[in-house]
Amino acid sequence: NLLQAGRGELALTLADALSDAWNGNAEAGFNNKLDKLRGLSGTYNNYIQIVANADSGIKTLADLKGKRVSVGAARSGTELNARAVFKAAGLSYQDMAKIEYLPFGESVELMKNRQLDATLQSAGLGVASIRDLATAVKIVVIPVPADVIAKIGDAAYQAAVIPANTYTGQTEDVATAAIPNFLVTHSGVPEELVYRKTKAMYENLDTLYAAHNAAKAIKREN
């Protein structure tokens, strides 16, 4: 919305949110088409990472019924991902004992204190919040099966894997969905400035790689 209004020059967004914005999906919070948006580059994938306390009894998406679950800040990319995955799995927020709209860090603290049973976090692999949780309590990473991903009906959601040992205690690969992130700008930004920004990023990939593990997925072919 800020880019559409010309109140910024660059943003990082999930592919499904970008599609919703471009098409004016009111259910996702976009009452008008954001037709001034322009793509700059693909970056890295967000992975749907649903993590439960090992003693919660949660092993599948269906087991989330009757449980206390955090889905990220309201209307955030993570929360939109949660809605899409739950709907495809035949679940709704009303099926849960409690839904919390909390940032990653706060969700983890509540799980440590046994005030939440599970959290859904859409982020790069090895996200710090889940690494922190996994060192404090035993966790289970809940799979998102391929048939659920297909039912979402959005090409932005791709079948992917959270590799074994991404988190402490996670000894097996876990199937999930991944959603690409894109850098976007708007039509009012001069082409020369867009070129310089893009060039600067790709000439400094080593710096990005050193700053964040997820950035290693950014390649020139993006």
Located regions from the model:
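Pocket-lining segment of extracytoplasmic ligand-binding domains
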Residues: 15, 26, 56, 93-190
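N-terminal secretory/targeting leader peptides
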Residues: 1, 5-7, 86, 114, ...
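N-terminal (or domain-start) structured segment
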Residues: 1-21, 29-30
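Segments of small-molecule ligand-sensing domains
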Residues: 172-222
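A structural signal for short loop-to-beta-strand junctions that line the ligand-binding cleft
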Residues: 30-43, 166-175
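Bilobed "Venus flytrap"/periplasmic-binding protein-like clamshell domains
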Residues: 1, 42-113, 205-206
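Structural recognition of the beta-strand scaffold that forms the well-ordered cores
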Residues: 9-14, 39, 49-51, 70-72, ...
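Extracytoplasmic
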Residues: 5, 34-37, 45-47, 66, ...
